[in-house]
């Protein structure tokens, strides 16, 4: 397997801390909305509206903001396709195809917003705009697809569903589904379903969290999720009505939910944390650091950065220290100084068209924690070639003073987009990961690829 070009490996042992005053709501009690059994209420006709682009208001404002930053960087760092600053490659054994399954078929919804979870019992479940699909790999049985449209209808909500996520809890052997509904403060809900069994295709206990979480005329967009030892965490961006996700941003929030309540179908015990700021500015797109080989707790960490930057070295690490109601609970916000700058990524050219694969921005796409070490990824522009690569950061907090290392990987040809990272270690202290990403170039149709990284780089 060919290895991506390694551009930089540096260490940074400097961290700056900033006292913050995040706000935690009083403990909330969210009643069970409904038990939904996917097998009993499956879709026969799979209704869908083709060529539907899920609405985000004022796309012109979106394009203007993003285009201005990218245009500046395009001029400063012009694209030089098929070039990299390093040609070093590491030989690895050819990958073996083992258990495999067909991916989600394109259903004409944009964006796809795919997410996937696999249980210890080999149950695979994927979600996308706008469907839930399950398969038992032990029996090779498909347990149908269930549209989020029908799920919203069964919950008495309008057909405005988007941004689905699915998480598997290996400690409790359960699945958790999250998706959003509605695009204004008066219609927006965060829907959370906890599976009653260890399958993803049975009954779920569904709850509706208010999208206007702070009751101040805002609505929730872009959820990210992680399960901890005691609690389930959902982050989201609060937006103003009739505004885009870029220009209408107010702040990011964190929902903290006692997960056992959801599994048992009881009233949820929950809190929402807000005012997660640094130097007076809200920290945007909080990405939970999931557990690597297993869940951790009672605390939870979150990553963020400056996703619209023309160039910076700030990485934000947010720490929720304990479970709901603990006297030791606190929210700490630190800015880690990265050893290398990152930049807003360039969009990816495609063959035979002037249209490009849009890469949005440099937000943290995924992160995990294994022991006292974190790994995370996002897209960043390479200033030497103008191409977009995968920024792979690592932070070690074992000494009490975070130490950060970072690499930027470029595909052999063209650019990368939308990276993700998964822990792949087996033994204690193992830092092996798999990083997957999309790629493309003016001479290369978009596709997907993956690399393996271990303690030796």
Give the role of each language-model region.
Residues 20-457:
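C-terminal PAP-associated
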